[in-house]
Each structure stands twice: as structure tokens, then as C-alpha cells.
């Protein structure tokens, strides 16, 4: 099993607090994060995992819910949780 370092951006922590304030089901986010931490790849199709482009090139986007996404970066040595939120909040 690949062992990666795990990082969380400062903005990610703020995004999580906002999601909690909006009464999002944090267990859904935790489960998706656990899949990534445990290297369960590819992710199940329900997460619609895909690479991002433009200014987010090098990052990936997985759907926690239809309009709740997790942006992360995955390399051989690192898993970085960058942002979470709605499409409008993150890409708008």
C-alpha cells in the first residue's frame, strides 16, 4: 500500500467549518476522505472524480453530493485536501 503524507490547506479548514454551519452531512465527506487516504482508487463512480483544468490543473474534483465537491491533489508522496464547497463557491 502506498503511504502518502496528508496535508490540509488553511482554506480547507475554513471550508469544512462553513459546511458544518450549513448542516452538511460531514460523515459523507469523511467517508470520501477515508477512501482517498486508504488509496481506494479509482473512486466509485458515484463520486464523479475527474482532473481539473486551468488554474486548478494538477488537482482533482470529487463529488460528495451533486453540488458539494472536494478538491484535492494526489501525488506519489502526498494527498492534499485543498477546498470543499459548492461549485459556485469554488469556481464561481
From Swiss-Prot:
It is an enzyme of class 3 (hydrolase). Its EC number is 3.1.-.-. Disruption phenotype: Cells missing yafQ show increased biofilm sensitivity to the antibiotics cefazolin (a beta-lactam inhibitor) and tobramycin (a protein synthesis inhibitor). There is no difference in antibiotic sensitivity in stationary phase planktonic cells. GO terms for molecular function: DNA binding; ribosome binding; RNA binding; RNA endonuclease activity; RNA endonuclease activity, producing 3'-phosphomonoesters. Induction: By the DNA damaging agent mitomycin C. The active site is at 87 (proton donor). Monomer in the absence of antitoxin. Forms a heterotetramer with antitoxin DinJ, with 2 YafQ-DinJ dimers associated via the N-terminus of the DinJ antitoxins (YafQ-(DinJ)2-YafQ). In this complex the toxin activity is inhibited. Binds the 70S ribosome via the 50S ribosomal subunit. Belongs to the RelE toxin family. YafQ subfamily. This is mRNA interferase toxin YafQ. It comes from Escherichia coli (strain K12). The gene is yafQ.
Amino acid at each position: 500500500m502506498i503511504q502518502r503524507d496528508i496535508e490540509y490547506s488553511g482554506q480547507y479548514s475554513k471550508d469544512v467549518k462553513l459546511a458544518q454551519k450549513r448542516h452538511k452531512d460531514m460523515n459523507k465527506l469523511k467517508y470520501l476522505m477515508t477512501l482517498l487516504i486508504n488509496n481506494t482508487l479509482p473512486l466509485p463512480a458515484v463520486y464523479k472524480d475527474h482532473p481539473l483544468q486551468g488554474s486548478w490543473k494538477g488537482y482533482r474534483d470529487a463529488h460528495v453530493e451533486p453540488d458539494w465537491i472536494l478538491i484535492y491533489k494526489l501525488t506519489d508522496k502526498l494527498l492534499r485536501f485543498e477546498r470543499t464547497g459548492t461549485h459556485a463557491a469554488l469556481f464561481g
